[in-house]
Amino acid sequence: MPNSNPVAAWKALKDGNARFVAGQPLHPSQGIERRASLTQAQRPTAVVFGCGDSRVAAEILFDQGLGDMFVVRTAGHVIDNAVLGSIEYAVTVLKVPLIVVLGHDSCGAVKATLSALDEGEVPSGFVRDIVERVTPSILLGRKAGLSRVDEFEAQHVNETVAQLQMRSTAIAQGLAAGTQAIVGTTYHLADGRVELRSHLGDIGEV
């Protein structure tokens, strides 16, 4: 998947996910020649910021290979300075045109946050920090009248998209220039489908 533009990059990922869902992956960019070609430099087309859940392996569900995607993962795709720095590196140094926020159903971080708010079950240690970072998304969702877990999961994805634009000047500049786009997506564990939830910038669809 060559370095491209947001529209072409998003199409490549959609096509790859369609192959994965159909059980017909091509497993591209995984041969000896591809591996050798990446020893000196990388030119990924997309940066995927996703949840650390072991069931949500970005390269597999988008049917991509070595050097195709720059992947950043945290539990609940929560943002901190290291995450922003990693994504900005991909955007400013590697010139990646597309940022994908990848959430999923049955998200433990969202469920833990709901339990903390509703039942006072606040986790200990650094897990508490994850819950605290997801909490604003849940509160915004409740203010909007959301009630189902899947609605809160989508809300958290959309809020993450908004936060990336608001907190990173580099990302905001790329969006303003039309050289970058951000998509918010959720992955369905049962059928493997990636669903578009929101986007900023031109990705070739409404």
Curated annotation (Swiss-Prot):
Cofactor: Zn(2+)
Keyword Ubl conjugation: yes
Top-level enzyme category: lyase
Signal sequence range: none
Pfam families in UniProt: Pro_CA
Keywords linked to the UniProt accession: Isopeptide bond, Lyase, Metal-binding, Ubl conjugation, Zinc
Keyword Cytoplasm recorded: no
Stated name of the protein: Carbonic anhydrase
Originating gene: cynT
